[in-house]
Amino acid sequence: MINARLKLAWSGFSLDVDLQLPGRSVTALFGQSGSGKTTCLRCIAGLERAPQAFIRINDEVWQDSEKGIFVPPHKRALGYVFQEASLFAHLSVLANLQFGLKRIAKAQRRVDMTQATELLGIGHLLDRHPQHLSGGERQRVGIARALLTSPRLLLMDEPLAALDSQRKSEILPYLQRLHDELEIPVLYVSHAQDEVARLADHLVLLSDGKALACGPIGETLARLDLPLAMDNDAGVIIEGQVSGYDADYQLLTLQLPDSSLNIRVTHAPMTTGQRLRCKVHARDISLTLQNSEFSSILNRLPVTVVSEQPADNAAHVLIRLDAGGTPLLARITRYSRDQLGVHPGQSLWAQIKAVAVLA
């Protein structure tokens, strides 16, 4: 468990958060520029000393302002990845990695050289120097070097912000591998919804130095009282379990979490039991009173209306739905709501027109 109570005030900005975060997953600190994301990270790292703070990683206290405890940054078992990798230009990639590795006694190493280079796909780069690497390659080396310090916590401050869309798409699969294969907790700062949707298990939504929400990403994205629900990309994350594959039509069947309901997505074959993360946008769900088998829409689920919220314009409303325990959002017109008589507790059918596979 990660506990971070942080309070500080500067001219024109104040931070006041109390975060209780899981100790094994990827937590995204999400919000607009100036919301306090990087300040939180710097305080946790000890690079910024908050006057009032309590920071504990599992059983290790890094700061307790009431008791006068402050562990300096270099003694905190953490890795920090910045927007641009700060590599030593005069050293090869291998020497840069060894610099991180040699700081840790052999008995305390949780990640070795082979594991780090394979996870980040940089084995073929070891003899090169940083000036001969692309931006994405430099960032992967920087992440590998941070991992080789065997951190108890990995802090990533917008690691893809300096990369173009092509380089981002190249590096995201490697970040997903870190998520899937390592047990190191990660705090990931970003203002890009696509990155957060693909990587995060837990979401902290920050605004003006305060945490508007903190919880599992699926539940948090489905909250109608948060500004994320008003975004054009509003929707929910579903992590389904593969339960079947139709080779003729190249369709995977995914079982929804804790439910007997399924959705189908176009995808390459996967092994039964594997998990696949998807996003269903609110704009891609329509509602109907009855199920229609004579439809080109593959995914039709029985749902219950939970609540309603006005959208960002007078013509639409947002409807929160429950599909066997999985939350969904639907963005429909006020006219359609009135025609269907939509109200909390009502049973309807959700027609999902598109499912975005996050891979």
UniProtKB/Swiss-Prot annotation:
The ABC transporter domain extends over 1-233
Location comes to: Cell inner membrane
Record GO cellular component, one term: plasma membrane
Identify the residues that the record assigns to the Mop domain, covering every copy. 294-359
E.C. designation(s): 7.3.2.5
Q: What class of enzyme is it?
A: translocase
Q: Which UniProt keywords apply?
A: ATP-binding, Cell inner membrane, Cell membrane, Membrane, Molybdenum, Nucleotide-binding, Translocase, Transport
How does it sit in the bilayer?
Peripheral membrane protein
What does it catalyze? molybdate(out) + ATP + H2O = molybdate(in) + ADP + phosphate + H(+)
Residues involved in ATP binding? 31-38
Q: Name one GO molecular function term.
A: ABC-type molybdate transporter activity
Q: Which PROSITE patterns match?
A: ABC_TRANSPORTER_1 (PS00211), ABC_TRANSPORTER_2 (PS50893), MODC (PS51241), MOP (PS51866)
Main subcellular location: membrane
Query: Which family does the record assign?
Result: Belongs to the ABC transporter superfamily. Molybdate importer (TC 3.A.1.8) family.
The record describes the protein's role as: Part of the ABC transporter complex ModABC involved in molybdenum import. Responsible for energy coupling to the transport system.
User: What name appears for this protein in its UniProt entry?
Assistant: Molybdenum import ATP-binding protein ModC
- From which lineage does this chain's organism come? Bacteria, Pseudomonadati, Pseudomonadota, Gammaproteobacteria, Pseudomonadales
